[in-house]
Amino acid sequence: MKKVALVTGAGQGIGKAIALRLVKDGFAVAIADYNDATAKAVASEINQAGGRAMAVKVDVSDRDQVFAAVEQARKTLGGFDVIVNNAGVAPSTPIESITPEIVDKVYNINVKGVIWGIQAAVEAFKKEGHGGKIINACSQAGHVGNPELAVYSSSKFAVRGLTQTAARDLAPLGITVNGYCPGIVKTPMWAEIDRQVSEAAGKPLGYGTAEFAKRITLGRLSEPEDVAACVSYLASPDSDYMTGQSLLIDGGMVFN
């Protein structure tokens, strides 16, 4: 029987790459996304290629929706083994521009979404009578504060703390909790960050990317597949003796 994973924010970008990689690794995958159309498109692509996937619409900031999505995946795909709490938003937020609305939106998705995902996964693992793997999207910005990204960066510091605490709390249940910390990845989300940062600096598109890219030791932007390969490891038995860690997969932007 195939193992089952649910990936949030899997309708595009890093989430889609993770879903495709997990299918390649032998998982049946629930494509969970706020955008129902993109989720269905990714699930269809997987199914047509001979894999097994289902689409589920979810707003990760809504606890009930997250629990319902995980339960739907468990029942439809026949089990539950891994959750990847990947969904997130990253608006440019110079300190003086931060509003209560921006803080609420980012924290509701990036932080609460991870908490609800952790809780829903634990419930599903208990119903299945075994442990499992919880994998959270952090960021290099969750290790080192990034300019112009105060709210996003602080939300990812929070995710790293949640990952460590959950790892300690859930170890007795046979559940590991780890994170992955991308750098600059060629995705629609990064294109929007570049637009906002470039615009705020009064520079042409690409300025933001160029400024951040100066810090990449390997000298290139990340492909979504680079991140998916890291998550593949965290979802596999090879990482069974790892918990509470947030792995940097950023091309050498941050060294710890």
Curated annotation (Swiss-Prot):
Keyword flag Transport: no
Binding positions (substrate): S139
GO molecular function ontology, one term from the record: diacetyl reductase ((S)-acetoin forming) (NAD+) activity
Coiled-coil region(s): none
An annotated GO BP: acetoin catabolic process
Gene3D superfamilies the UniProt entry points to: NAD(P)-binding Rossmann-like Domain (3.40.50.720)
Signal peptide: none
Catalytic activity: (S)-acetoin + NAD(+) = diacetyl + NADH + H(+)
SUPFAM superfamilies in UniProt: NAD(P)-binding Rossmann-fold domains (SSF51735)
Superkingdom: Bacteria
Assigned EC number: 1.1.1.304
Record keyword Transmembrane helix present: no
Residues bound to NAD(+): 6-33, 59, 156
PANTHER family listed in its UniProt record: DEHYDROGENASES, SHORT CHAIN, ESTRADIOL 17-BETA-DEHYDROGENASE 8-RELATED
Assembly and binders: Homotetramer.
NCBIfam families referenced in this protein's UniProt entry, alphabetically: 23BDH (TIGR02415), PRK07231.1 (NF005559), PRK08643.1 (NF006394)
Known role: Catalyzes the reversible reduction of (S)-acetoin to 2,3-butanediol in the presence of NADH.
Protein name stated in the entry: Diacetyl reductase [(S)-acetoin forming]
Source species: Klebsiella pneumoniae
Gene name linked to the record: budC
